Structure formats: C-alpha cells, structure tokens
Amino acid sequence: MSRRYFGTDGIRGRANGLITPELALKVGQAAGLAFQRGEHRHRVVIGKDTRLSGYMIENALVAGFTSVGMDVLLVGPMPTPAVAMLTKSMRADLGVMISASHNLFEDNGIKLFGPLGYKLSDDVEKQIELMLDESLDKKLAQSASLGRARRIDGVHDRYIEFAKRTLPRELSLEGLRVVIDCANGAAYKVVPEALWELGADVISIGVEPDGFNINKECGSTAPQALCAKVREMRADIGIALDGDADRVILVDERGHVVDGDQLLAVIGQSWKEDGRLAKPGVVATVMSNLGLERFLAGEGIALLRTPVGDRYVLEQMLKDGYNVGGESSGHIILSDFNTTGDGFVAALQVLAMVQKLGRPVSEVCHRFDPLPQILKNVRYRSGRPLDDSGVISAIQDGEKRLNGHGRLLIRPSGTEPVIRVMGEGDDHDVVEEVVDSIVDALGNAAAAAA
C-alpha cells in the first residue's frame, strides 16, 4: 500500500495545507486507538517546537486523543529526543512531537513515538494510515471515559539531568567558551541552561523564537551566523542544532564546519579506543562520504550503510547490535543513551573528548578529508527514466570509470518526481563528467517520455 500521509519522519507538510486541525484531530484519534493496549489508564506525552502553527496542532491533537479516552501530558517546547525520553520515563503509551524539524515556519509535522521512545515501525504507521481515511465516530469514548489534559512542569530539568548523566560525573566544561545556536527552536531554553550547569562559558544565539523565525538563517542548516560568532568571540567551539534539536553540526575555533560524517568518525574512533563500541562498526546512510568509510576502515571499524533516514539507521543498529550511527546531516544516534537522534547529547560527547585531550576542536574533529561529492537532480513528468537503455548504459559506463576510486548513487525521490544522481571519488573532474553523463541520459529519457 502506498503511504498518503507518513513519510520517512512522520507526517510533514505545509501548516493549513496538508497539516490541518482536522488531520491532527484524526491523527490523535487514530494513534490513540492504536495504542490503547491493556486495561490501564492510557496517556500520551505531547511536545512541540516554536512554530506559530504549533498551538493550533497541539489543541487539535489534544481533542483527538481525549476523545478516544487517552490522557494528555503537555510539555511545551522541548527537543524531540527529550519527548522520546519523557515518553518512556513517564510510562506513557505514546509520544508526539509537533515539528517539521529543519524546515522553515510555514511547515509543520507530527512525529510519533511508541512507549519505549522509538519511532513507529512501518507496520504501525500503516495501521494508523488506514484509520485516517475511515470514520471513527463509533470508536469514540463514552462521556465518562473521556481523557484529561494537563501541562507538566519541571520537564526541562528532567532533560538537563538526563543529558548531564551521559558524561562522567567528574567532567566539567569549565574553561571552554561555547557558542550555542538553538535555531530559535525547541532547545532555546534547555540547552544553554545545561551547558551553563556543566561549567561552560556560554554564548547563545538563535534563542529568541517568535513563531516565525525557526531555522531562519540560523541552526544546523544555516551555520554562517554561528561560524562568524565563533570567530568574533574567539570561542573554542560552536554548536548548531536544528529546530527540534535532533540533529547537530559543530564549528571549530577557526569557524570551520564539522558535519555529521566527521562526528561519526571522531565518536567512532574514540569509543573504539575506550572500549565503548558495542561492535567494531558504525551505521550510516548511503549518503555518507566515502572518505568516512575509508577512515573507519583504517581504524578497524566497518561502515554499514542504510537507506536515507535516521529511522533506518536506528533499525540497523538495533537489529545488529551497534551503538553508534547517524547521517551526514547531523542526526547522530548513540543508543547507549537515546532511542532517537539527539544533537545535544552527541555534542556533549565531543566536548568531553576536547576536555580530555586538551586539544583544539580543529584537531579533534577533522579526522579525514571528504572526497569530492556531486549531487544533481533530474525532474521528470512521467514514465520510468531509470529503465531507459541509454540511462542504464550511462550508469554502467560511470561505474567502470569510478571502479575502486569512487561510487555512484542513483535513486528516485520518495516525495516528488525527481531522480537524484550522486557521485563521489578521488578525482573531482572525473566524478563531474560521470554525473553529467548520467544526468544528460536521464534528461533525454524524461523528454522522450513527456
């Protein structure tokens, strides 16, 4: 069955476009019914980021959940990993995060977590999808069995203590000047406070949300302001989170960006040296740079690749027993601590290494030189361009040219009629020629089918 609502990270779209109060109400009802297992009083934890539309969606979800007899615990603006943690810690049946992650304020979304804090499986999402398109009137709770809603105080302190406990008790960040960019998003209160409690000299930007400025020229997808601030303040490190704080990038003392691949390299190598890797491997997606794979191989660490999406990374980690994984975009999953990506916890592990080694971030975090990588998109109207003989031939020729010196990844988008062509290798010019050849072939095939 094709999925109409759920993508790779919950339901996401334009507020009052796809994401309407009516849809949120129905999601609350359907998810509430799907997770009413057992005879106990059922409850759901709901958090959100700082988008203007969060109020509208939150109220609609509350109406949906309470109408099927589920109690609602509202925690307000909180990082996605905090909502996952609270779902488990508060013995809830379900967790919900209202966020469109790194998107701008016009979009919003609904992420769902099971009782142990993990994102839902495809099968459970399909079960909920089926209910979204049917009438649930006959399944609503009786008047005396309706749910209640209440706001929970003190949740910021719970997450701060959780994050601090991922570091050794004796470790302090005293002496480190840290610039934190919270993307005007969900972490704007809790993360600067946690860094201060750990002893860092904290300079905060992206901590003045107004409902409209989440991820706007700030955060992990737009680190230019952070890079400039680190240089201006002569800071030791910059940390950039996205709107819901499940991804992170760092900036070294020179103002240079450290992406998710470099973070996987430094954490993977460090944890192997300390005997903390559950198995000699790290899980990443097909988009991670070949330079990461080569670096890890030199350290005796395998790189396992999954489809794009942090949920697939986590599935592989749980299936095969790995405890470090992530994406080049900055979703870092450390399953010793988290059930989902946690940008702040990942950053703390690197800060701990910087303190332990007494070396600048530029030396600690730049473990390999990324190979040149070129990504191009080809839009098409109809047909199956990847089945065209000219395209197949161009791909085969490209693979021969890159054999042993690079790789190709050609995949259709899951959300729009676009073919994504990615090539990387030791020689930039060769990679560009290979990618352009495939793009030209795809363009010809798309034009012929139009």
UniProtKB/Swiss-Prot annotation:
* List of residues that carry Phosphoserine: 101
Catalytic machinery residues: 101 (phosphoserine intermediate)
**Gene3D superfamilies from the entry?**
Alpha-D-Glucose-1,6-Bisphosphate, subunit A, domain 3, Alpha-D-phosphohexomutase, C-terminal domain
The alphabetized UniProt keywords are: Isomerase, Magnesium, Metal-binding, Phosphoprotein
Which cofactors does the annotated protein need, by name? Mg(2+)
Molecular function terms in GO for this entry?
Answer: magnesium ion binding; phosphoglucosamine mutase activity; phosphomannomutase activity
| Enzyme Commission number, as recorded | 5.4.2.10
One GO BP annotation of this record: peptidoglycan biosynthetic process
Post-translationally, this protein is described as follows, namely:
Activated by phosphorylation.
InterPro entries associated with the record: A-D-PHexomutase_a/b/a-I, A-D-PHexomutase_a/b/a-I/II/III, A-D-PHexomutase_a/b/a-II, A-D-PHexomutase_a/b/a-III, A-D-PHexomutase_C, A-D-PHexomutase_C_sf, Alpha-D-phosphohexomutase_SF, GlmM_bact
Reaction it catalyzes: alpha-D-glucosamine 1-phosphate = D-glucosamine 6-phosphate
Q: How is the cofactor bound?
A: Binds 1 Mg(2+) ion per subunit.
Q: Which NCBIfam families match?
A: glmM, PRK10887.1
* Family per similarity comment: Belongs to the phosphohexose mutase family.
UniProt protein name: Phosphoglucosamine mutase
Q: What is the lineage of its organism?
A: Bacteria, Pseudomonadati, Pseudomonadota, Alphaproteobacteria, Hyphomicrobiales
**Protein encoded by which gene:** glmM
